[in-house]
Amino acid sequence: MAKEIVLGIDLGTTNSVVSIVEGKNPTVLENPNGKRTTPSVVAFKNGEIIVGDAAKRQVETNPDTIISIKRLMGTNKTVKANNKEYKPEEISAMILSYMKDYAEKKLGQKVSKAVITVPAYFDNAEREATKNAGRIAGLEVLRIINEPTAAALAFGLDKNKAMKVLVYDLGGGTFDVSVLDLEDGTFEVLSTSGDNHLGGDDWDNEIVKWLTKEIKTKYSYDVSKDKYALARLKENAEKAKIDLSNQSVVQINIPFLAMSANGPINVELSLKRSEFEAMTSHLLDRTRKPIEDALKEAKLSANDIHEVLLVGGSTRMPAVQDMVKRTLGKEPNRSINPDEVVSIGAAIQGGVLAGHIDDILLLDVTPLTLGIETLGGVATPLIPRNTTIPATKSQVFSTAADNQTEVTISVIQGERQMASDNKMLGRFNLTGIEAAPRGVPQIEVTFSIDVNGITKVSAKDMKTQKEQTITIENSSKLSEEEIQKFIKDAEANKEADAKRKEEAETIVRAESLIDQVKKALEAQGDKADAKTKEESDKLIKELQDLIDKKDIPTLKAKLEEVENMMKNFANFAQQANATKDQSSKDQEEVATVVEE
């Protein structure tokens, strides 16, 4: 196989899959056990690293077994195993390395490049961690793409007609909904929604809770304090969930689960599908609203959707399929294996990047507005939410004080008009600014979001060309609850926020004009007559009193007096380097500063 091969990897919470594209046809690669999905499990035993099916078989007996590491990606947490502390990236790298190795053996050649998928709501830190895991595994990660987007890519490979597609992706540990527009080989994401803390594992856990309660009632034994027994319950709960997708009732038989005072406990219980659906209905309900939110954000109704694609093994549950059908009014498309479709889409994107496929263009979006904090605590947006990525936006700001040689750029994410109501992503300082009157230095702030959804922010002094850059790396996950809270809060507080913003901007404008009047009086010196000085001092005092009282309506009226008074200084524009219009413009673009 002479052509360059790019692996398409779905690095999942519970299972992972690797695919390739040969010509234009995607192929899922089997692991050494002949399976197309590999458990995302790592175990350590006698100095050996064990990955996949063999590791999963040790979950019950080997305490040095790690599962669901994806939930910790992008955090500072570590896991202890094999008498060592491991970062999430290291464990994920072991899974990736295992898949890379068996792919190379299957293909008969070395492979060094990959496209890896992540949930749509993975933040910068989680995406960076995923890329780093790939690097540790010896892979050059060409692209990080969203799982629902990858699924749509796989679904639409041979589709030439225009259509709107909704992707419902319920995996082992995460849930995503995306709405896409497919036309002439272009895949444009219109909206995304979801929950980073909801997946098939949660359905398993409900069965575990039920089993724990039943065992305590029937056998008088508290399983919750028995780690070994809990691991066995978890395994049997997952099996029961899977079986209930095809059966109306399952028998759960667990011989020798534990030893009680009355002897060995042999569990024999039955669980009906109706009971299972009742105990997990609250989980299913949590997936309904993201569907509605994604449609609303895309400005579409359910009737506008042409195809509904189910992704993730958890979508095999009949209750999930029925809910999606009722909510959207159409039968979901189940023509592609839900466990494999994301990896197939990643492989297709790899084929595009390798030049094997040339009739597909993928356009993803950013989920929330990005901006900076400006003078008065105002949130100034640079990149609005649902902007197609990659994207770059620059805006020029200035200083807020005379002779200021340093500014602090505070990067925020969210939809509120005041910075303090949004999420702080990071901050950095730009130093070495040439001393000058306030409003004179020109500082260009640039936001760049790459194709992987990773954000970089830079600030550059246009005169000295000094520049500082930060890559946003959040230490905490941004959950769907946070996302929706930001959006709802912005809507609910729209009028109040607008009032607060107007107050802040009016005060900033007043303080700026007071400063300019004082400078103008100083510049005039003895040339200014006593009456003008007296009137100016009086107005400045009144203005400052109104600022202190936050009497905004009266303050706005007084501002007009100050501005009219300033017209008496004929040469003010040259001496203070600001006119009324320039002052207004400057104050709209003044960054938050650190005064030295």
Swiss-Prot record:
InterPro entries associated with the record: ATPase_NBD (IPR043129), Chaperone_DnaK (IPR012725), Heat_shock_70_CS (IPR018181), HSP70_C_sf (IPR029048), HSP70_peptide-bd_sf (IPR029047), Hsp_70_fam (IPR013126)
Sequence positions bearing Phosphothreonine: 174
Pfam family, any one: HSP70
Keyword list, A-Z: ATP-binding, Chaperone, Nucleotide-binding, Phosphoprotein, Stress response
KW tRNA processing (keyword) present: no
Induction of expression: By stress conditions e.g. heat shock.
CDD domains, per the entry: ASKHA_NBD_HSP70_DnaK-like
Superkingdom as given in the UniProt entry: Bacteria
GO function terms (MF aspect): ATP binding; ATP-dependent protein folding chaperone; unfolded protein binding
Gene3D superfamilies in alphabetical order: 1.20.1270.10, 3.30.420.40, Actin, Chain A, domain 4, Substrate Binding Domain Of DNAk, Chain A, domain 1
Disordered as annotated region, ranges: 576-596
Alphabetical list of HAMAP family matching this protein: DnaK
Known role: Acts as a chaperone.
Family: Belongs to the heat shock protein 70 family.
Name assigned to this protein: Chaperone protein DnaK
Organism from which the protein derives: Mycoplasmopsis synoviae (strain 53) (Mycoplasma synoviae)
